[in-house]
């Protein structure tokens, strides 16, 4: 059962949120990770890989600072590859392909073993602000949870839309609902929101195509 007052509340349980929660808790702060689905903490949304050009260096830096991403990647790896080997060493970038299901499972397992860290499944719909200072979050189930600091790691879920062909519908990821409420709340405090798009093209076997 979560408590009503924390040092840090992390909103969102993706890779950024999981790392933020682990870092906060390991530094001794009483931390709460709030996510809409506890079963998808640390889940790989698309390509089940960590690292790559530029990103591989970031994962190594996180690892050097005591983060979990590199450890989880190693424990769930099915392939390691150094990219750009045809170029100079400064251009080399490590990448690991992981078992998607095991990756999320291992992330959750490591977080559950982290001291000072609690979990709560709910949607954050707004911030609690008093005298221009963050005091906590409001949730979709009507709970007010108080904290000294709030870290937002919402990923693609804020008012998320999924487009399939000419159709579109709300969702932060296929099969998961989008996060609503917090965007308009942030806008009421003067933040400006925009929309970015990412796409996953279909994988088609060229040998299956018939040329007419």
Please tell me what each predicted stretch does.
Residues 5, 22-130, 141, 153-173, ...:
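Conserved N-terminal/central alpha/beta ligand/cofactor-binding core
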Residues 19:
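N-terminal, positively charged regions that mediate nucleic acid binding
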Residues 137-139:
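SH3/SH3-like beta-barrel fold
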Residues 7, 135, 148:
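Conserved acidic residues
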Residues 3-16:
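Beta1/beta-strand and adjacent pyrophosphate-binding region of the FAD-binding site
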Residues 11, 145-155:
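Short hydrophobic core segments
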